[in-house]
Amino acid sequence: NLEPNVKDAPGGLRDVQLIDWTAKRHFNVTRRSQLVEKGFLLQHEYLKLYADEEFLWKVRYGLHLIADRAEERLLFDHQRTLAKMLGYEDMMGKLGVEKFMQKYYQTVLSIRGLNDVLHQHLDEAIYRDNKTKHNSQISEHFFVRDGLLDTISHDTFRFYPTGLIEIFVILGENNEIEGIRASTIRQIRHSTHLIDANFRADAKNRKLFMRLLNAPYRLSFQLNRMNRYGILGKYLPEFGKIVGQMQHDLFHIYPVDVHTLEVIKNIRRLARPEMAKQFPIPSHIFKNLAKPELLIISALYHDIAKGRGGDHSSLGAEDVADFSKRHELQENETKLVRWLVKNHLIMSFVSQREDISDPQVIHRFAEQVGDQMHLDYLYVLTVGDINATNPNLWTEWKGSLLQNLYMQTKKALERGLGIPIDKSRWSQNAKNVISKKLLEHDIAIEQAEKIWGDIGDE
């Protein structure tokens, strides 16, 4: 988050110690280097873990110097000072503190990825060792062994690189599979170099990625796995640039990649029955979208251009248009996702910063949206985005503003944009409603009419 705990946060020093404690206990060794001899760690994993740990110790030591006491949290007020202390300078339009925080987040992501391998390794060695062996082949290149997905051979990805996407599709389409075997996670992490321009140009890989975005089970979990193992940023290089990318402000508390995947998670959760109570309209809309994968693509790209300089919405719109062309979206689908990325902030802006009781504001927003389909997709994207920016950002009040804007715009679109908005008609309608309420309570309307005479239609 915005102020991660260097010791106890996921991927922090405690995770490194946990690797040491559990592995040394299981293998009965005293030094981490002996874990290489035991085959638990590969040599390059050992060296990378050492480098990552050394970086975190430097950060922790620097924090203690700055705070003049034991301080484990990378407090916002300390981040800029610590970045300068460690040699990160402002350069090429990017703040030194943002470069430092990106290095931090990429480091803990690397440790988390290695943790996946090692903890799965221990799970198999300790808890699954005496299980009844049950294997079932699920595709030409993969089979399920005791609930865990495995490759047919130790070099499957070398001969079948497409498997680097297919394995996540299988997980997204088969909810009964518990996870991936440690040896296979290791293969994935060590095969990212196979994802090159030719891989990205392969129609089969592109179709598989689109199939993944339609997968019924735990899509955000699979995308997070792909991110930890380095696959997502290799397949989508533009996504790779935002991995660990932080904005040094108090508004955005997550790195851009984490925020993006959280938006997708929020959107997909709307399909759950329990979400209908908290988000009744967005939930209903999402369940009835003709092409929900277009919303997922828009979410994946809405902040893709953060950190480049310039208008990230416009730059991201160009990126998603390129993605759409590569993945053979229809022209109308491309136009929709491009529009959503370019305009993903407008509904939040209008609902919170403009007077949505003004018919002209509603009419202007309805003109920007154009039709009901664009309004539906934008509303769900906006709800998912706000909830993934900062847990404290979403309030019932902001939710009611968004819902009010949605409903008024829906009515404006139903009425037709070609019909000019008559403020006096809106005002008269309001008077009629009030008059009816007054009469129901046996209250004379003369006093209200006197007040109305002193104020305008607004």
Question: What is the role of each PLM region?
Answer:
Residues 37, 44-45, 49-58, 65, ...:
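Divalent metal-dependent catalytic cores for phosphoryl transfer on phosphate-bearing substrates
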Residues 197-298, 307-313, 318-328, 342:
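Long, K/E/R/D-enriched contiguous segments that form extended
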Residues 55-56, 95-149, 219-221, 366-458:
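Regulatory modules associated with amino-acid/nitrogen control
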Residues 76-81, 128-134, 184-192, 239-245, ...:
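A glycine-rich phosphate-binding loop feature that marks nucleotide/adenosyl-phosphate handling sites
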Residues 110, 166, 170, 208-211, ...:
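Alpha-helical scaffold segments in soluble metabolic enzymes
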Residues 18-20, 262, 388:
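Hydrophobic side chains within alpha-helical segments
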Residues 1-252:
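Non-catalytic interface/linker regions that flank or bridge core catalytic/transmembrane domains
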